[in-house]
Amino acid sequence: MGELIEYGKKALEYGNYADFKQTMDTVVEEVEEGFVKIGYLLKVARDTAVLQESGYATVNEFAEKEYGLDKSAVSRFIAINDRFAEGGYAPRLQEQYRGMGRAKLSIMLMLPEWINEEISPDYSKSDIQAIRAEVAEEEKTTDLEILMEEREDIYDRLENDLQRVLWKLGQDIPELYCKLWKEYMRADNVEQLAKEVMEIMAPAGEGMHSARISGIGRLMLSLKGADRDLVLINVRSGEKQRYGWDDMEAAFDLLMGSDSAEESWETVYGAEMPGVAPVQPESRKTSRVSPAVMEENNPAAGQN
């Protein structure tokens, strides 16, 4: 009982929320920065004579004997520091990667820089794993195989890659097309349209949608807010294209019409619309990543 009273007295040291929050923020930051500092110190041990008096011949031997870190763990800590620390050699993360944590950054080590630039700390580990799976899947196809792929005729008639991605997403996910059609028809202006599209395509406030375009490869559409440009990333080349919401409205002008979403879809894709699954209750945790639909899993592909 005396111990509980003692803890209670200590708790009184935080006289207000601001003091408590400042302390909490400091502790959390120390935990987040710990792994990058470990990588930095391991590099110091590797690159300087600091271990000379220790009796250890290598940094791997030192880390194993003193801290139980095997060779792969040492390599991972160092790689994270190389890639994400300030200047590639510092005890502190670059600003844009603070708050990520070791688990997320370990996955991001396997992603190209042009994709990592689009990932915020709000992306979950499973979101980043989904992005990694998309990149890994695209890596299975060689550049020569891309050149040999038969392109959809419609791709040459559309004006830009944003229109091509939206066309493909609509074909692959008729439910998405129907939701977007409804909001496009209701929107009075591009600002309203942008807000409604964000609610549909990025309800968590940001998100990525992947579509595979034959003859081009995977393109990932990054949405970060109704007041920010859309970014279209070529997974293979790293090329980034920026579009405004007026460009998305122009794409919908081309891809949507008729008196109903189903009639519009069938006109655009020249096929009978597949059965649309009933709307499911929203899960407690909203994914920020929508992977590409593969042709073999898409009943709508190849009908037109």
Please place each PLM-identified region on the residue numbering:
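Charge-rich, acidic-biased intrinsically disordered regions
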Residues: 49-65, 98-99
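Long, intrinsically disordered, low-complexity Ser/Thr/Pro-rich regulatory/activation regions
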Residues: 100-120
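Short Lys/Arg-enriched helix C-cap and helix-to-coil transition segments
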Residues: 55-57, 85-104
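Solvent-exposed, amphipathic alpha-helical segments
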Residues: 23, 41-45, 107-114
